[in-house]
Each structure stands twice: as C-alpha cells, then as structure tokens.
Amino acid sequence: MSKAQFSTKERILDAAETLFAQYGFGGTSLRQVTSQADVNIAAVNYHFGSKENLVNEVFRR
C-alpha cells in the first residue's frame, strides 16, 4: 500500500471513529465521514466497500 493510500485510509478511519463515538452508527452518514476526512465517497467504497465494513475496521483498530 502506498503512503497516499495509507494516509487516505487512516484519515477515513480517524473521521469514522470520531463520528461513530459522537453520533453512533445510525446517526453517522458516509457523507459526514467523507467530509471530515476530506475524501470522496469513492475512496470509502474502495477501502471499505460499505458503512458496515468501515465500522468493523474501526472496532478492529
């Protein structure tokens, strides 16, 4: 994985962790995650495939 990919994935995970902690899974949209991580939805889909996979990765950290 390149440094840019690692950075993007980490930014998404950091944003998701913060938002899930603050608003819960149901109260957090992927749009909020992408906005906070400064990425587009395609990056989330590329790295995680779904919101469920994203939250699972947050828990694995």
Language-model features: where?
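Short, basic, alpha-helical segments at the C-terminal edge of helix-turn-helix-like DNA-binding modules
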Residues: R60-R61
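Basic, helix-initiating cap at the start of DNA-binding domains
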Residues: M1-Y23, T28-D38, E52-N56
